[in-house]
Structure formats: C-alpha cells, structure tokens
C-alpha cells in the first residue's frame, strides 16, 4: 500500500476555492430582474400609445367616426361623399326607368312595332288561305330581310313610320314568312286616326310567288270622298 505521504498534492488556493464554491443563483436572479424590468418598461410604453386617427376624405370615409368628431374639412368631405352617392342613386334610377320605358314602347306596348309584327304573324297563321299556301301553321316561321345565312334571320323587321298631311301616323312594314310548302312576303300598312290611339289596318296581305295575293285586311275607301276631293284632275289631301 502506498504511503499517504507519497500521494500527489491537490492543494488549491483558498481564494480560488471560494470562487468555485460560490453559487451562481444570485447572478441568474439579477438577469431575471433585468429582463423583467425591460419588459415592464416596454409594456408600459405600448399601453400608453394610442393609434393614430386616420384623416377622413371623400374616398376614405367609411362612417366610423361620428359627425361631432370630424373637423371642418372632414365634414365637407363627408357631405361631398354623400352628395355623390345620392347623384349615383338618382342616375341609376333614371337609367333603369329609361330602360323599362324603352322596353315597353318597343316591345310590350300594343302600339309598338314588335307587337304589331307578332299580331300580323298570328293573323297569317290563323288564315286558312295562307296555311294552304305555306303549310302547317305550327311550322311557319317569320323573319326580317332574307339572307343567305340561317343564323341572320333575326334581323330587325323593315319598318317605316311617317305622318300624312292630316297629321295621322302611318306604319309600313314587310317581312318574310316560310312554311313547309312555300315562302312569301307579308305586306303591312297601318294608320292611327287622329281621334284614336290604336292602329288600324289599311292593308295586310301575303304575296307568294306563282299565286294570287291573299288579302287579309284592306281599308275600303268611303264612297264619294275621293271624287269630292278631286278637282280639275288634282287629288287634294
């Protein structure tokens, strides 16, 4: 057995031993306190800061601020925005009314050209003389000016409107009809008397090539009227 006197000496200076044996908890506590202090300072400064109020303009006003919170310039901006919104609403209402008026006068009104066209087509389909020439009424089609393409048959009907010397309105139109047997042209001439607001037929006829004209409506001239107005070979109107 080795003698204790021969063991290596492990003597450590007293000052160094004291440093090694000193606990490190106080230093960690100091760091924790320092971090907590900095966090408290940061939180305190954030809690005291208030969000910056956005200026109200004509384009950015969303109504979040009350009228009393606005400055003079912002009140002018809000009033301008509300005026513009009102003008947009009025313009939209006027345009909508104009569209409905146009649809009524051009499509749904009994005096419209579309209405009279549909009425004339129905008269052709209901007349036995016309169906004898054209074929089955269920297969009769009516369209505008004839073209080489079947996709262009929905063209506007050729129509003219004018007033005579007495101030009476006249409407003339012609359109094509086609059935399984033949095709033809429908001639329409209507007049609106001064004392009425409805169109009256002066002529409604169907022309089919190779056949006599089929007259569905033709106004009869009042006897003696033409002779009374004709003086020295001149027809007075």
Swiss-Prot record:
Protein's name in the database: Mitochondrial import inner membrane translocase subunit tim21
Main location (coarse class): mitochondrion
One Pfam short name: TIM21
Family: Belongs to the TIM21 family.
Native organism: Aspergillus fumigatus (strain ATCC MYA-4609 / CBS 101355 / FGSC A1100 / Af293) (Neosartorya fumigata)
Mitochondrial matrix side, ranges: 36-83
Transit peptide location: 1-35
Summary of subunit composition and partner proteins: Component of the TIM23 complex, at least composed of TIM23/timX, TIM17/timQ, tim50 and TIM21/timU.
Keyword annotations from UniProtKB, A to Z: Membrane, Mitochondrion, Mitochondrion inner membrane, Protein transport, Transit peptide, Translocation, Transmembrane, Transmembrane helix, Transport
Localization (cell): Mitochondrion inner membrane
Cross-referenced InterPro entries: Tim21, Tim21_IMS_sf
Record membrane topology: Single-pass membrane protein
Mitochondrial intermembrane side: 105-237
GO BP, one annotated term: protein import into mitochondrial matrix
Its biological purpose: Essential component of the TIM23 complex, a complex that mediates the translocation of transit peptide-containing proteins across the mitochondrial inner membrane. Required to keep the TOM and the TIM23 complexes in close contact. At some point, it is released from the TOM23 complex to allow protein translocation into the mitochondrial matrix.
GO CC, any one term: TIM23 mitochondrial import inner membrane translocase complex
Domain of life according to the entry: Eukaryota
Transmembrane segments: 84-104
């Amino acid at each position: 057995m080795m003698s204790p006197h021969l063991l290596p000496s492990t003597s450590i200076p007293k000052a160094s031993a004291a440093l090694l044996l000193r606990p490190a908890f106080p230093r960690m506590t100091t760091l924790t306190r320092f971090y907590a202090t900095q966090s408290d300072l940061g939180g305190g400064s954030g809690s005291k800061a208030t969000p910056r109020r956005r200026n109200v303009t004509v384009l950015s006003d969303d109504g979040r601020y009350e009228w009393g919170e606005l400055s003079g310039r912002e009140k002018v901006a809000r009033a301008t925005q509300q005026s513009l919104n009102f003008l947009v609403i009025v313009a939209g209402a006027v345009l909508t009314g104009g569209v409905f008026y146009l649809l009524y006068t051009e499509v749904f009104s009994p005096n419209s050209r579309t209405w009279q066209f549909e009425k004339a087509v129905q008269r052709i389909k209901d007349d036995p003389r016309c169906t004898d020439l054209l074929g089955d009424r269920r297969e009769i089609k009516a369209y505008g000016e004839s073209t080489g393409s079947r996709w262009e048959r929905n063209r506007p009907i050729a129509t003219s409107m004018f007033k005579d010397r007495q101030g009476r309105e006249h409407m003339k139109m012609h359109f094509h009809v086609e059935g399984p047997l033949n095709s033809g042209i429908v001639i329409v001439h209507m007049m609106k008397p001064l004392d009425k607001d409805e169109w009256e037929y002066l002529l409604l006829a169907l022309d089919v090539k190779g056949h006599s004209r089929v007259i569905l409506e033709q106004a009869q001239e009042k006897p003696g009227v033409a002779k009374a107005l004709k003086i020295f070979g001149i027809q007075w109107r």
